[in-house]
């Protein structure tokens, strides 16, 4: 299992503006963990991208205390990707699989991204931040753009806990 970690300096140099915007309020440095299981005769490439928000306070659009209680689990998508890649490598499957795990903490501070700020994503698109608590899609878009550019996967799947609004729409 091949592993590579892109740290904050490399993320900045390579235009990961959306991911860095989410991490801007935190003292914890962001990273992008890349995992790869590549057996010799694999023909197609599957990419898995998992949301790795280690704690989600909501940023400046801060969550209420009760809504914030379980937010250390906002990295379950990342955990699934890591577990899948480790399992594939241990079982020596014949699948070529890329795992991308953007890791950030979404916190409020004087350096945090503000609602209304405009950031440039890894794909070169500009994004206006409407709500700092919609951080998952920002870190996923930078990771997905990087994976497409670098690995050109046949199939890409993202795994994430994205919004509590689905409970309003669908019920518990």
Regions found by a protein language model. Name each.
Residues 1-172:
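A generic structural signal for tightly packed, nonpolar segments enriched in small/aliphatic residues
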């Amino acid at each position: 299992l091949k592993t590579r970690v892109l740290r904050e300096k490399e993320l900045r140099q390579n235009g990961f503006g959306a991911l860095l915007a989410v991490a801007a309020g935190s003292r914890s440095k962001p990273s992008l963990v890349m995992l790869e299981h590549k057996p010799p005769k694999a023909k197609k490439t599957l990419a898995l991208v998992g949301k790795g928000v280690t704690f989600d306070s909501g940023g400046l659009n801060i969550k209420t205390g009760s809504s914030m209680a379980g937010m250390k689990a906002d990295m379950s998508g990342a955990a699934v990707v890591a577990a899948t890649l480790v399992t594939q490598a241990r079982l020596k499957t014949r699948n070529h699989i890329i795992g991308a795990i953007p890791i950030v903490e979404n916190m409020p501070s004087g350096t945090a991204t503000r609602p209304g700020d405009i950031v440039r994503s890894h794909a070169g698109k500009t994004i206006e931040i409407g709500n700092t608590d919609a951080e998952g899609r920002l870190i996923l878009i930078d990771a997905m753009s990087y994976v497409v550019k670098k690995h050109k996967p046949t199939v890409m799947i993202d795994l994430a806990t994205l919004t509590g609004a689905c409970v309003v729409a669908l019920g518990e």
